[in-house]
Amino acid sequence: GSLSFSLATAGCVFRCLNCQNWEISQKKPEETKDPRGPELRLRPPVAGLTAADVARLSMFPEDVVALAQWTKSASISYTYSEPTAYYEYTYDTCKLARERGIKNVLVTCGSMEEPPMRDLGRYLDAAHVDLKGFDEGVYWKLNAGRLQPILKTLKTLKSMGVWFEIINLVVPTYTDKPDMIRRMCDWLAANIGPDQPIHFSRFHPQHKLQTLPPTPVEILLQAQSIARSAGLRYAYIGNVPGLRDAETTFCPNCKRAVVTRDVFAITGFYLNAGRCSFCQTKIAGIWS
């Protein structure tokens, strides 16, 4: 793997009942100002900065890129809240990062109109898109959002050649129905293709859904099985440390494990120039 410099601002376009970052995503920027003093403007050199210093910075795009360079990060990830809420800042930073040879990774709910998505997509190297369910009623009840714009975003990213992976948080009583998961996987196979990874993540009680239990592992295994039956070649299970092969990438041809993982660590890597070391089949993804 490689190092990514992650950042966010306050605010989000959704109101997810289960948000794990609600302390920043459900607040305005002025509500998250550091209480220790006025904002500081970043000035080089950055080598002497501490975490406390960074917490008080008013960072312009050039500051973000400078810090990413100083930390020798291969990419910048726009994450934690929702980059759509600070679109212009994300766009300007992405553009500058591309000029400086740093990759851009967008972590998003996907609720964006097509024109700005295409404008931003020119500077994206990868994206993580949350597909929070496959029912309009559930989307509104759980997230105060709509499903169709997210499906449009997936199609747009695919048409632009931006690599993306899909995350589906399986929330008990909301998005854990096998029929919903099956319809979602069938749609992805037909409209996006078999090579886009999908991660079924385990829900843990958060924010306004603290009375719900964590997602049963059996439900996640069933979701993974449904995805594979629908023809999706790379189906994973997330947020379940220690679950055997939950995060392993298998070659779709010879079925050998080509990338093994333990939470955030890569424990085995059997690819050569993006191809399976055992049978030379091309494995979808970004491997450089």
Enumerate the predicted regions with their spans.
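Short glycine-enriched, charge-decorated loop/helix-capping segments at active-site entrances
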Residues: T50-V54, W140-R146, L212-P213
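Structural preference for beta-strand elements that scaffold enzyme active sites
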Residues: S75-S77, K103-V105, A126-H128, W163-E165, ...
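Conserved glycine-rich "GG(E/T)P / GGGxP" loop and the immediately following alpha-helix
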Residues: Q69-D92, V138-L151, N168-R183, A189
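Auxiliary Fe-S-binding modules of radical SAM enzymes
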Residues: T173-S288
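Helix C-cap/helix->beta junction micro-motif
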Residues: T71, R100, M160, I192-P194, ...
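Conserved Radical SAM active-site core
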Residues: G1-A126
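Conserved radical SAM core fold
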Residues: S25-K28, P83-A85, S111-M117, A127-A144, ...
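Alpha-helical scaffolding segments of alpha/beta enzyme cores, especially the outer helices
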Residues: D63-A66, E88-E99, P115, D119-R122, ...
